A protein has these predicted regions:
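N-terminal, leucine/charged-rich tether regions that mediate assembly and partner docking
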Residues: 1-166
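Charged heptad-repeat coiled-coil "rod" segments that mediate homo-/hetero-oligomerization
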Residues: 161-180
Length: 180
């Protein structure tokens, strides 16, 4: 069951391997949040991040009900797994509402993007060099940047990426037939 699909412009910061490149960029990314409920399996929340301008960008993160207590304890979260998807959606919607303001209070930051081909215009290095990618939902105030949530995200598996590219191609073909 797909819960939410949000288009956000987020600030992308260079990863540790690209520490010499201090240029941050804004990109419009789509966050799709899906809650999988299957009999005899734990519920799983999946976050999928795509870039309409670059179809090779596809990041995913999944948190199961069984994994959530560790995330909750590590980050001091106050909600249970049943409430987590709605709170994540609310945080992302807050970021979306702040977009375009001179000094937005809420934002999404992806760091370690050198591990994702195309995200900062480079190709991925070997796994030993290109550490993980972290999505942070942050709030800025006059004193500091507060991280509400940090989730590890990873480039999607090859089969998932191929399905995504096929969907993108299908959309282009449909738009071409419609004359759009």
């Amino acid at each position: 069951m797909e819960l939410c699909c949000l288009d956000l412009t987020v600030q992308l910061l260079p990863g540790q391997i690209d520490a010499g490149d201090s240029v941050a960029q804004n990109r419009k990314l789509t966050f799709t949040i899906t809650l999988t409920i299957a009999p005899n399996l734990p519920q799983t929340l999946c976050v999928r991040i795509t870039d309409a301008d670059d179809p090779q960008v596809l990041l995913t993160s999944c948190v199961s009900a069984a994994d959530y207590p560790g995330l909750k304890a590590a980050q001091g979260l106050l909600v249970d797994f049943q409430s987590f998807p709605q709170h994540l959606i609310q945080l992302l919607q807050s970021c979306q509402q702040q977009h375009g303001q001179l000094q937005p209070r809420m934002g999404v930051v992806l760091s370690g993007c050198g591990a994702v081909p195309g995200l900062l215009g480079e190709t991925a290095g070997p796994p030993s060099q290109s550490g993980g990618v972290v999505m942070q939902v942050v709030e800025h105030n006059s004193f500091r940047r507060l991280c509400h949530l940090a989730m590890a995200v990873a480039p999607a598996a090859t089969a998932t990426k191929l399905r995504h590219l096929a969907d993108c191609l299908s959309q282009l073909q449909v738009c071409g037939m419609c004359g759009v």
